[in-house]
């Protein structure tokens, strides 16, 4: 069995976790108490959803997940919410005092008190697996727990489970909507620490999701519930191939193989289509060609950046629902001729395709329409460097005046870590720049460099 363990860190991670597990349960027909009427093999079995759920002898399905937060309020909502019976109480781990938006608290002072407990719980989950495939880590860049504790956890997971892949779903701080002044600090510190430990990181930018909710779903003032339900659809599309049997299934390691050309350049851009409200869906036929084309619209991306300014290094299309390979090939052929999609010259224009016959499910009473087919595109493009540049610029503005730095130093960090992290980010921007440069011109000087 190829199991995956999901780890939800901090408020953002936990709330996205709630949305994701709610959706998974609906997709698999699992009730909030963990019973699954459709499941014929009690207490085990080798169904594909067992990658995400373990089964007890009583026929209860328990998510292979850990929820961690350094303060109790958010996870208390899970403990009292609709799905309280779904999770094992030990899977919900809370501390006493929060990280106060401070990376240093999440990583050093408060985080280190709880890390061993968390790893212990993860070990228990891992021991139940026959062939653990890897970890999915959900967190935000801006929060103290999401940035600091996640980077600590990733370092420790690399030590304990060296060869297992670690994928991140990271909430990138929105350019306009900010929940904390120090988000740029936390984001850059966590990216620097996690860069060498993460195999692939899907970034989601709150502002991009806000815009999609406003524009496509006509929600004037989107709440976090709206955002998380949309994010959970994307996560579900990416993980569908692990949870269902499909025609062209995609494994966790397969994502990395196809999307990550160099270890550091592992930030694919996710795009999902169709995002459409019920009243509109009734009047539109959403063919494979249409939804595939929608994926190349910058408006449907999960991070604000413009792929038309960048070059694609790899592209992966994950379809679900009523889709046949013939339609997909036709759609891709059309896009290759019509769209001005620039690939880097060292990469042939390959599109990796996954098809899953399970149609998308929507949360009843939610904003999204039930559609026959959907697609999630994961593309590795040099344009995402724009997002890093934005963040680095904000970091520089504050750090030039050393604003707020004393809070971090007071928690046992050294100022050198800031400059070290910033240099690493500058190197990352440079890496993206070099990857996009055509290889023919720079042949002479490139020879000496090792990759």
From Swiss-Prot:
Residues 432-451 are annotated as: Disordered. Gene3D superfamilies: Helix hairpin bin, Tubulin/FtsZ, C-terminal domain, Tubulin/FtsZ, GTPase domain. GO terms for cellular component: cilium; cytoplasm; cytoplasmic microtubule; microtubule; microtubule cytoskeleton. It comes from the Eukaryota. There is a cross-link at residues 326, 370 (Glycyl lysine isopeptide (Lys-Gly) (interchain with G-Cter in ubiquitin)). It is found in: Cytoplasm, Cytoskeleton. Mg(2+) binds at residue 71. Induction: Autoregulated by feedback control of mRNA degradation. In excess of soluble tubulin, TTC5/STRAP cofactor triggers cotranslation degradation of tubulin mRNA. It is an enzyme of class 3 (hydrolase). Some glutamate residues at the C-terminus are polyglutamylated, resulting in polyglutamate chains on the gamma-carboxyl group. Polyglutamylation plays a key role in microtubule severing by spastin (SPAST). SPAST preferentially recognizes and acts on microtubules decorated with short polyglutamate tails: severing activity by SPAST increases as the number of glutamates per tubulin rises from one to eight, but decreases beyond this glutamylation threshold. Glutamylation is also involved in cilia motility. A motif (MREC motif) lies at residues 1-4. Keywords: Acetylation, Cytoplasm, Cytoskeleton, GTP-binding, Hydrolase, Isopeptide bond, Methylation, Microtubule, Nitration, Nucleotide-binding, Phosphoprotein, Ubl conjugation. Pfam families: Tubulin, Tubulin_C. The modification Phosphoserine is found at residues 48, 232, 439. The modification N6-acetyllysine is found at residue 40. The modification N6,N6,N6-trimethyllysine is found at residue 40. GTP binds at residues 10-12, 15, 71, 99, 140, 143-146, 179, 183, 206, 224, 228, 252. Its EC number is 3.6.5.-. Its cofactor is Mg(2+). The modification 5-glutamyl polyglutamate is found at residues 443, 445. Belongs to the tubulin family. Heterodimer of alpha- and beta-tubulin. A typical microtubule is a hollow water-filled tube with an outer diameter of 25 nm and an inner diameter of 15 nM. Alpha-beta heterodimers associate head-to-tail to form protofilaments running lengthwise along the microtubule wall with the beta-tubulin subunit facing the microtubule plus end conferring a structural polarity. Microtubules usually have 13 protofilaments but different protofilament numbers can be found in some organisms and specialized cells. Tubulin is the major constituent of microtubules, protein filaments consisting of alpha- and beta-tubulin heterodimers. Microtubules grow by the addition of GTP-tubulin dimers to the microtubule end, where a stabilizing cap forms. Below the cap, tubulin dimers are in GDP-bound state, owing to GTPase activity of alpha-tubulin. The MREC motif mediates interaction with TTC5/STRAP and may be critical for tubulin autoregulation. This is Tubulin alpha-1B chain. It comes from Homo sapiens. The gene is TUBA1B.
């Amino acid at each position: 069995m190829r199991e995956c363990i999901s780890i939800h860190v901090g408020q953002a991670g936990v709330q996205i976790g709630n949305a994701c597990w709610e959706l998974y349960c609906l997709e698999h027909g699992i009730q909030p108490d963990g019973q699954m009427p459709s499941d014929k093999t009690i207490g085990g079995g080798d169904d594909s959803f067992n990658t995400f759920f373990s089964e007890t002898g009583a026929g209860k399905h328990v998510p292979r997940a850990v929820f961690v937060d350094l303060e109790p309020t958010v996870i208390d909502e899970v403990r009292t919410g609709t799905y309280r019976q779904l999770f094992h109480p030990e899977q919900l781990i809370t501390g006493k005092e929060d990280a106060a938006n401070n990376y240093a608290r999440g990583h050093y002072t408060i985080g280190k008190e709880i890390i061993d407990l968390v790893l212990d719980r993860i070990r228990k989950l891992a021991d139940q697996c026959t062939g653990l495939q890897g970890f999915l880590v959900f967190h935000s860049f801006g929060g103290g727990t999401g940035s600091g504790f996640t980077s600590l956890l990733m370092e420790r997971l690399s030590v304990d489970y060296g060869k297992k892949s670690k994928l991140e779903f990271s909430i990138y701080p929105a350019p306009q909507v900010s929940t904390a002044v120090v988000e740029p600090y936390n984001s850059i510190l966590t990216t620097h620490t996690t860069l060498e430990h993460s195999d692939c990181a899907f970034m989601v930018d709150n502002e991009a999701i806000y815009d999609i909710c406003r524009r496509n779903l006509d929600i004037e003032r989107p709440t976090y519930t709206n955002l998380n339900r949309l994010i959970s659809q994307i996560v579900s599309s990416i993980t569908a191939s692990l949870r269902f049997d499909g025609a062209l299934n995609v494994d966790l390691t397969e994502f990395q193989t196809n999307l990550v050309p160099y270890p550091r350049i592992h930030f694919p851009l996710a795009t999902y289509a169709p995002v459409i409200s019920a009243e509109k869906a009734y009047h539109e036929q959403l063919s494979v060609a249409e939804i595939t084309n929608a994926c190349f619209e910058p408006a449907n991306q999960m991070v604000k950046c413009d792929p038309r300014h960048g070059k694609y290094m790899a592209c992966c299309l994950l379809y679900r629902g009523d889709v046949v390979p013939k339609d997909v090939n036709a759609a891709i052929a059309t896009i290759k001729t019509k769209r001005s999609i620039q690939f880097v010259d060292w990469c042939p224009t390959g599109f990796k395709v996954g098809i899953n016959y399970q149609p998308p499910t929507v949360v009843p009473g939610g904003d999204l329409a039930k559609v026959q087919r959907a697609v999630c595109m994961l593309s590795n493009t040099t344009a995402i460097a724009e997002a890093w540049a934005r963040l680095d610029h904000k970091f520089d503005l504050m750090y030039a005046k050393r604003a707020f730095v004393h809070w971090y130093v007071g928690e046992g960090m050294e100022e050198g870590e800031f400059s070290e992290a910033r240099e690493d980010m500058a190197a990352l921007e440079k890496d993206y720049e070099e990857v996009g440069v055509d290889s023919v011109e720079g042949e002479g000087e490139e020879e000496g460099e090792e990759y």
